[in-house]
């Protein structure tokens, strides 16, 4: 309904049970640190050990800080929440059995946080 009414995508896609996730993954950096380090932090997605998406936060059309501020105007944002912010170029289909790994990493390559799942 929200999409049909041309309301913001976030409101069209964010509702209870809209995304099922596996185990929680630790992140060894705080969100306020990411706000200061957007030039040094990147996102990478591999499917079956092949990099399909990779870019740095500085290249996002809307910064993480701006996204959190805008979302906070109409929804509570709490520590531990997952925020789906869009992705770098390279969006593509997934198939049953695909191994998917998402990583948040420092510019020097050190991984800050990672998530792994197999599509079912």
Tell where the protein language model's regions lie, with residue ranges.
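Catalytic-core "active-site belt" of small-molecule-metabolizing enzymes
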Residues: 1-82, 90-120
């Amino acid at each position: 309904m929200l999409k049909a009414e041309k309301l913001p995508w976030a409101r069209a896609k964010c509702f209870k049970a809209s995304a099922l996730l596996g185990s929680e993954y630790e992140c060894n950096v705080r969100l306020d640190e990411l706000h200061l380090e957007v030039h040094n932090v990147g996102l990478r997605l591999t499917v079956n050990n092949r990099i399909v998406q990779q870019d740095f936060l500085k290249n996002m059309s809307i910064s993480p800080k701006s996204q959190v501020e805008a979302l906070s105007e109409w929804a509570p944002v709490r520590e531990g929440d997952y925020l789906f912010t869009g992705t770098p170029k390279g969006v593509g289909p997934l198939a049953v059995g695909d191994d998917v790994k998402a990583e948040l990493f420092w510019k020097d390559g050190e991984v800050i946080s990672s998530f792994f799942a197999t599509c079912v």
